[in-house]
Amino acid sequence: MKMWRLLLLGVATGRCLHEETQKSVRLLRPPFSQMPTHFRSSILPLPGSHEPRPLRIQTYYSRAPVPGEAWDPEGETRALAAVTETTRRIQGILAVLPVQGPLLLSRDPAQYCHAVWGDPDTPNYQRCSILNPGYKGESCLGAKIPDAHLRGYSLWPEHGLPQLIQPDGPGVQNADFLLYVQVAHTSKCHKEPSVIAYAACCQLDSEDRPLAGTIVYCGQHLRSPTLSHDDIVMATLHELLHALGFSGQLFKMWRDCPSGLSARENCSTRKQVTRRDERGQLLLTTPAVSHSLAKHLGVPGTLQGAPLEEKQGSLSSHWESRLLQGSIMTATFHGAQHTRLDPVTLAAFEDSGWYQVNHSAAEELLWGQGSGPDFGLVSTCRTGSSDFFCTGSGLGCHYLHLDKGSCDSDSTLEGCRIYKPLAKGSECWKEENGLHTRAENPHGEIYHRHSRCFLANLTSQVLSKHTSQPSTAPDLEDPTGCCYLHQCTHKGAYEVQVEGSPWIPCLPGKAVQIPGYDGLLYCPQGRLCLRDEGARAATSQPMSFTTQDLLSQLSLRLTGTPGHSLGKGQREELAEVVLQALVMRAGTSRCYFHSPTITTSLVFTVSMWKSPGCHGPSVAMLHRTLTLTLQMKPLQVHHGEAIFTTDYSKLWTSLDHNPSMTELLLSTGFCLLVLILVGALGTLAYQKRAMLQVAPSTT
């Protein structure tokens, strides 16, 4: 089990509990002699029809037994929405040889059996001779496993046939992995206020691939206003990757399949997965991982392996954060905005021998990119040779330049220091963090969704009249992290804008002066505008956007149970439920949708734009998709005992900088809407509106 901490204070504290808790879980695998024929067939080499298929994860939610007043519906709703999105995402990343027939889990003989036959000369040697009268079934990290998911068990005489006590359950169809979900406030949650969730793997198949696990959410912690839906999704993804195989307890079971998953007869347990290098650093040494890390660091050929975090000993289940800061599988969590499902982690799942991996799903990891073989070493991080690290305790910029940061360290960094996001108000891309008047803003900062953090010592205040070089005036402060607008002109090149200034070209690696300000603004190299996507929209008011980055507003009128009125708090709850349904319908993450509200007349409104770090289709594409799907199939959501259905939808697009383009797009959209309505009227008359429930499948 792993606990991932939400860093509310910008500093990682406490220790990771994954290794010791996963070690406490008894991993079960089926004895071959007791496996049913259909299960055996799924692990033997078969004809080509048994090719890898997307991993089918079936989720089962069970409410933990708690007093009624302790039940947390808000935490439950947020957790289940995150599970749904995360399992869908994993299915697009990992593929397995599908389980043939229904998936059945094993029972633990140590639980249901009190004694076994001990004479090796008897035919029923080691089979259950006395049942445990206190046996109450199987569980996985506290979650009870239904008998329907389990194989049966028998009582055996010393000689002869057994007495069937419990037959096999029907099993779970169309499943390769069973995930049990609980929302609770356990003792672990109580002891660790920053824990979002933790998970464990409980059962393996005959080739040691994980078959089942449980994730436990700390329900009361999910109420935190600083915890976004994307944060919970990313924490869930981290935990499920542990349960699916990225674990010190499972590394030794990884398999080498040189001919691929389909040729199982050529697979064998890997002889060596981890070892220590000449410095004593623990490495994960499998081939795809070693090659992927070498590519990331810009090292020709391959490396010995990828370093593992060793704070908890040799059974580490996380990457060394000095080397892979920002990876989904490091031991500390700095929020979804700063976390990536990186190529090295996906390479590890390829090396497990259990999965075929969709490497195109990997997200670029900027930390240490192209920095060479000595990057991240304790011996080099304090020499100033890399600007990914810092010295002292001053203020600067987080390496992604989304946030201001403080130069700090923690136990996982072993003395190395990095810029960590400040506790509050450090996000340059949040307009609400901005100052209100120029008198309060001598540095000319602009907080905007296209703003980034730059090292600067700009000031509009009058300096010493004896200074002939304003940019180097002795009255100037040392450069610190400041928020300014940026826009890309082409790959690797961009412009910046300070409050009241024109756009100024910012040559990476150089410093620029800004008209109306003393001091300098330093242009980071290799951090911004890394993709060749043309100019990005990032201008002063009035705002303008490219056609791929439209700022839209979606409005939905809801119809509900007659006579059912809602108070303010209930409208806020309903807005959240509708938003979750909308996210599920869109098939994207929540980072596209902002500031949902519902009026007293039941009109739901939400703004649409891509947050920094948001990955997926353009807003324009999502705009078109939602226009079509909401007309063809309205949303239907439940709130308490009432049912609400969307009656109509409107999508407004802000393109104030170009009225003619606005008119053109609105006209085109209106014509498209008319065509859609005409084509849909006939089918809508016969179509039964499907009920959308915001919860993972329970079948």
UniProtKB/Swiss-Prot annotation:
SUPFAM superfamilies: Metalloproteases ('zincins'), catalytic domain (SSF55486). Residues 19-663 are extracellular. It is found in: Membrane. One of its GO terms (cellular component) is membrane. PROSITE patterns: ZINC_PROTEASE (PS00142). Specifically expressed in ciliated left-right organizer. Its cofactor is Zn(2+). The keyword Hydrolase applies. The keyword Hydrolase applies. It is an enzyme of class 3 (hydrolase). Its EC number is 3.4.24.-. Residues 1-18 form the signal peptide. One of its GO terms (molecular function) is metalloendopeptidase activity. PANTHER family: CILIATED LEFT-RIGHT ORGANIZER METALLOPEPTIDASE, LEISHMANOLYSIN-LIKE PEPTIDASE. Putative metalloproteinase that plays a role in left-right patterning process. This is Ciliated left-right organizer metallopeptidase.
